[in-house]
Structures are given as structure tokens and as C-alpha cells.
Amino acid sequence: MTTRNLFPLLLLTLAVGCQGGAHAKSGDDPFYLPQPHQPFEGKVDTRIGSLEFDNQYPSKESMERILDNMDFHGATQAYLWGIPIASFSNLQYYTDNVFKVRQGELLKTATLDQKLGILTANATTPYIIGTVNLESTGPFVIDVPVGKTAGMVDDFWQRPITDIGLAGPDKGKGAKYLVTPPGYKGAEPSGYRVIESPTNNIFIGVRMLEADPKKAAALQSKFRTYAYKDRANPPKNLYPQPSAKYFFGPPRGMAFWERLHEILNREVVAERDRFFMAMLKRVGIEKGKPFNPTPRQKKLLEQAAFVGEAMAKANDLAKRSTKPYWKGANWKIALGLDPTQRMENYDQLDERAEWMYEAVTTSAGMVTTTPGLGSVYLASYADKDGNWLDGAKSYKLHVTANPPAEQFWSVAVYSWDTRTLIDNEQKRAAQSSRQDLIKNADGSFDLYYGPTAPKGKEKNWVQTIPGQGWWVYLRFYAPTKAYFDKSWRIGDFEKLK
């Protein structure tokens, strides 16, 4: 067809397009949208409802709807953005107001009940966890003893400031770390590993890797944490155990915004976060001002907290940042986030929300690529047919012989609603190589999950709860080459009849 013959066809196409005017329908899109270069006029059906324009001006009702949606969508994105700092702030709320521990004092956890408040806690190892307000303490000392420990110091956006223990610069040989507040100008004393925090508040978390519980408890007692100004006579660390129910994760409903407002007023605003602060300003959350939302703002924030969490759930389950670890498998790397959260041209907003909705903390040691060092985490939420794991159904997981871990491996079960260790009547939430599991003749293991134990397999069973979704982390501590080259592979969950 020649160019001359195309011209009448082009005129006909333009004429048909003009007849559609502002209400022309595009493909399979369910909404009528203005065509390019056509004015906004009349009634237009959109994703946020019907909008009306007169002389291109939105009607009063449309104006209110547009601004409400603008504020609402900004709040849902601020929810995803605020998850990491809201989680740490919530732990700090409990330590300061419920447990009333001294500033700089940490919590000690060992049993399942003591760990039930922590997002995706390791069920196998004891912990020391807590937060420190550097504005209150000034430079802060963490005296790490010699021994098998693994942990980190994170800022309040859950970015690692340093690893400590076997994967840290002390390499398990012990060291004194001195953490300074942002912009600290004081002298750096000798004998300390000095690190500056980008935030006024920090998190400290350490797990004891000793297999013997007595040795692990002894190692816990050797940690010392205190303000540098008290170094001549540091107070004795008590490291109390949690004395009440708590939640180390982002709270629900208005409590999320209350925690977020409170911590943002005690923190430095980074350049990368200024636009999110602008979104929060629309709904009554401002640095330097009290949080007194209007009835309209409160209703909007309540809805945004619910939808924001729904987005976090979907974003987490989709795990768009990672692919199946083995082709055709329902196992993915749980931590698909760079610990720095920074890529060449963007910061990892979705990836950060994906991990920190279901878990807490990051460190270089948690994303190790070095055999024999650190740890790795694989997550599975579905059976081999792609159906979500259901607490009312029973499953088998076949663990191939010689799991690739120098220290130990474990499979821990978590409630999908709370993202914490499953709180079952059995009072067991994990299986690991440190337990007396039934081993098959070829060295493999068959693990079982469901409301009731299969006869003769009780040692290898974790009880699930009908009405609750659940998922697992497969952890390898000091993973071996067989993990990294993928020569070792685990099966998917098989639903039992």
C-alpha cells in the first residue's frame, strides 16, 4: 500500500477517535479515559470512582475524592516505607514502657515462650536483643566476648552498622565496639572498634551458636553493654528475660502511626526520606509537632494501615525481587535485600518492605556468599502444587542427606498472621540437626507438619493450627559449597491424604 493510499485511512481513524471524545474506551481497559490532546470534560469513570469535570474543572465532590485518594495512597506507601523503623520502635516501646529496663540494658531470650514476640526468631539458639538511644547514652560500648556468636548492630532503618561475632571483624575472638551518634566529633579512643551510627537509635542482636545450652548461657552472661562515659565503673548487666507478652514487629492500626510519629521525632531525617515525610505531613504526622489527627485523617490512617499491611503481605508473598532458588521449586531466598538497601539508581523500597514485614534485622553475615561463614535463609509458603500451606492439612518435607551446614541446620515454622514462631499446644516450632530426629537409612530426614502427629514420627513432627496459614525458614549456619553450587537440593512440601 502506498503512502498516498494510507492518507484517507489515517483521516478516517482520526475522525473515529474524535467522535469518542473524552469517553473513548482504550482496548480492554474498564475505564473511560480522555484521549491524548482531548480536554477533561464531563463524567469520567476511573479506578478511584466517577470524576466529573465542567470546563475542565473538577466538581467539588470529585475534588474531595481526588485529594482523599492522594492522601490515602501516600499513606499506604508511607506504611511500606515505615515498616523497618516502626518495628524497631515497637521493641523499644516495650523495653522502655513495659519491661522498664535501664537504658542500654538488653533482653535475654532462650525458650519458645520468650521468643514468641519476635518476628521469625530462630527457635534453636539463645539471643540477646535490645535497643539503645544514643542521644541519651552518648557513645556506647558493646563488649563482645570470645566465642561462637553471630550478630549485628543495625541502625533504626535496619541497615547494618557492623556484624559482630564470627562473621564480624572480631571473627569470634572478642572485641570492644564503640558506637557513636550521628555526627560525633569526639576523639576515637584506642582499644575500640569505633563505628558511627547514621541514626540516633540502634539495635543490638546476637545469637549464641554454642550447641551446649550451658555453654551458650555462659556466653550470654559474658556480654557487656554500657555507655562509654561509664567505662571506669560500668553498671552490672542484668539482661532480664521478657516478663510479659510483647511484639517485635510493626504494630497494627493506629498504633503503627503513633510509633512512627514518635520515633521520627527522635530521629534524623535523611535526604532520601524527605518526600515520604511530605506524604505523612498531609495526614497529620510532622516532625516537631504533636500527632493529633482530625476525624478525617484518623479514618484515612486506619484504612491506610489496613491496606498498607495488605500490600505488605502481597508484596512479601510475591517476592518479586527473587526467583526460586532451584528451578521448579517453591523455595526462595528469604532475604532478597541488599543490606545497604542501596542500588545504583534507587533505594530498595519494595525489597525492604518484603523482608521486614516478615522479619527483623539485616547484616552482611545473613546474606553470605562465602562457604563456612555466616548464614543463609530459604523460605517456602506453598506445597509442591503451589497451594498455600494450611494449618488444617498435613504435609511431609523430605530433607536430602547431608544438609549443607557446618554448624547446624533448622526448619522453623511461623504463623503467617503474626510472622512469629507458631504457638501450638506441642510447644515446639522447629526441627534441627541439634535435635534427636529420626534419620532414614540413607541419611535423609522426613519431617512432618499438621494438626496431629503421624504414628511413630512424633520426633520429626511440628503441630500446625487449623485456621492458620504458616510457612517455614530453612536455615543453614556456616553453609557449605553444596548450598552455593546447588548440588544439594531439598524437596517441596507434599500434602498427605
Predicted regions and their residues:
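Bacterial N-terminal signal peptides
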Residues: 8-17
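Alpha-helical and His/Cys-centered functional microenvironments
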Residues: 1, 13, 23
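Predominantly soluble domains enriched in secretory-pathway, periplasmic, or organellar proteins
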Residues: 20
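A compositional/structural signature for long, glycine/proline-rich flexible linkers
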Residues: 23-497
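Bacterial N-terminal signal peptides that target proteins for export
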Residues: 1-8
